[in-house]
Amino acid sequence: MKDLSNYRKSYEKSELLETNIPEDPITLFKKWFHEVEDFGGIEEVNAMTVSSIGLDGFPKARVVLLKQFTYEGFIFYTNYDSEKGRAIANNPNICLSFFWHSLERQIIIKGKVKKIAENLSDGYFESRPNGSKLGAIVSNQSEVIASRMILEEKLKQLEDNCVGKEILRPKNWGGYIVEPQEVEFWQGRPNRLHDRIRYKLSADFYWKIERLAP
């Protein structure tokens, strides 16, 4: 057995107090996101862990890139027929997690997910590089394949067929929006007495703010 107990550090970079937070979580998310962007040196600051409940009843988590966020929710794109897409179709309750170690911060978002309008998916797909567009068409995401060579051959054939043509979004690929119902902000603090502030959406769409024990 490898002992990992010596991996530890003290978190001392910031604090999270009720006296300096906004009334809604999206405003605070925007503030933290801009701060991690400005911090520099962090690749793909929009990387998040998306956790869903699979058809087998087990949770599954994977890293996905956040592409937009608004006061309505958080948007990412994927293959609707993938394992992730099938899980979402069966159970729309999912969780998003962000961890920005350099700032000693974590955000956990729980909510319900639904597909965005097709024209929005079309617009984002059009903005992607051609290679990414073709990759979305070629890959039957999450399906078992015999070899990587099969994918590369399919991609080459599709590239040849699409020369000089518009590459349209496949109908089984598009965006989801996660409508938050609960958002927790975690700020590392000394002696493991971390700050945890939770925003919880009430039945009348009012955000209740609570402090949680670390």
From Swiss-Prot:
Q: Which SUPFAM superfamilies match?
A: FMN-binding split barrel
Residues that, per the record, bind FMN: R62, V63, V64, L65, L66, K67, Y77, T78, K84, Q106, Q141, S142, W186, R196
Q: Which cofactor does it need?
A: FMN
What chemistry does it catalyse, as a reaction equation? pyridoxamine 5'-phosphate + O2 + H2O = pyridoxal 5'-phosphate + H2O2 + NH4(+); pyridoxine 5'-phosphate + O2 = pyridoxal 5'-phosphate + H2O2
Q: What is the free-text note on the cofactor? A: Binds 1 FMN per subunit.
**What does the record list as GO biological process?**
pyridoxine biosynthetic process
Note the Pfam families from the entry: PNP_phzG_C, PNPOx_N
* Metabolic or biological pathway, per its Swiss-Prot or TrEMBL entry: Cofactor metabolism; pyridoxal 5'-phosphate salvage; pyridoxal 5'-phosphate from pyridoxamine 5'-phosphate: step 1/1; Cofactor metabolism; pyridoxal 5'-phosphate salvage; pyridoxal 5'-phosphate from pyridoxine 5'-phosphate: step 1/1
Please indicate if the UniProt record lists Manganese as a keyword.
Answer: no
Q: Which residues form a coiled coil?
A: none
Record keyword Flavoprotein present? yes
- State the function annotated in the UniProt record: Catalyzes the oxidation of either pyridoxine 5'-phosphate (PNP) or pyridoxamine 5'-phosphate (PMP) into pyridoxal 5'-phosphate (PLP).
State the similarity comment.
Belongs to the pyridoxamine 5'-phosphate oxidase family.
What PANTHER family does the record tag this protein with? Answer: PYRIDOXINE-5'-PHOSPHATE OXIDASE (PTHR10851:SF0), PYRIDOXINE-5-PHOSPHATE OXIDASE (PTHR10851)
Quaternary data: Homodimer.
Q: Protein name, please?
A: Pyridoxine/pyridoxamine 5'-phosphate oxidase
